[in-house]
Design a protein with these regions (language model features):
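Positively charged n-region of N-terminal signal peptides that target proteins for export
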Residues: 1-6
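Carbohydrate-interacting regions of secretory-pathway proteins
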Residues: 22-228
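Bacterial N-terminal signal peptides
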Residues: 7-16
Length: 228
């Protein structure tokens, strides 16, 4: 790995780079390549998204959404991200096709400071349009727009958790009445079974904003003991 945010700490750092555990994680930007990603029509990525000299994935112009070639069910996803001023992006997971649209739950990424009047469930690290924070004690730890932040998503069985810079923001269950009610109140209410599927693709969204990702690692948790 080229770099890791300081808050990872020695325990997590050792976990991610030790020979034994490294085999459990897949580097989704391995060898500075986009071979593990594709466009929605299955084509290779040829414009918009590019790997920079420092190994980061940079969306500088319109490049369309990127879908992982593989599907993931239960997983532990780590990533670093940086967004432009007034920017909006996100990482979707368990993505599947609904009619002509690829939809899934989303770890929202945006310049929150530019949208003070936006609904809270659109803030960074929310489950986009469904949940803001799962408890009042949860709080976001912001960094400057010129710095990378660190995101983490653990999806295991019915439990969904989002972290931002080491702080837990979302802790929800997709089999709860609270979740069902949130879907009914969201833009996805017309999509039958939205959020109920337990496997699908990852998606890096293109909303017309400049965004950067690096150190994108995923570990499959299917059949594994519950991660605390």
């Amino acid at each position: 790995m080229k770099s890791l945010a300081p808050w990872f700490g020695s325990v997590v750092l050792t976990l991610l780079i030790s020979p034994a555990s490294a085999q459990q994680y897949t580097d989704l930007l391995k060898d500075g390549s986009l071979s593990q990603w594709m466009l929605a029509n299955g084509d290779d990525v040829t414009k918009g998204w590019q790997i920079e000299k420092d190994g980061s994935l940079h969306l500088a112009g319109r490049g369309d959404n990127l879908l992982s070639r593989e599907d993931f069910g239960d997983f532990d996803l780590w990533f670093e991200w940086k967004i432009s001023a007034k920017g909006n992006s996100g990482i979707k997971y368990r993505v599947m096709k609904y009619g002509n649209s690829w939809l899934g739950l989303e770890y929202q990424i945006q310049d929150d400071s530019a949208f003070p009047k936006m609904s809270a469930e659109h803030y960074t690290a929310s489950i986009y349009d469904l949940f803001d924070k799962s408890a009042e004690i949860f709080s976001r730890s912001y960094r400057g727009l010129d710095e990378y932040s660190v995101g983490r998503v653990i999806v295991q069985r019915h439990r969904i958790r989002h972290w931002m810079n080491g702080k837990l923001i979302i802790d929800e269950r997709d089999d709860s009445q609270r979740f069902a009610d949130a879907v009914k109140d969201s833009k996805f209410r017309g999509q039958q079974g939205f959020g109920a599927n337990h496997s699908g693709k990852l998606m890096l969204t293109d909303h017309g904003s400049e965004v950067w990702y690096r150190n994108v690692f995923i570990r499959r948790l299917d059949g594994c003991a519950l991660v605390p």
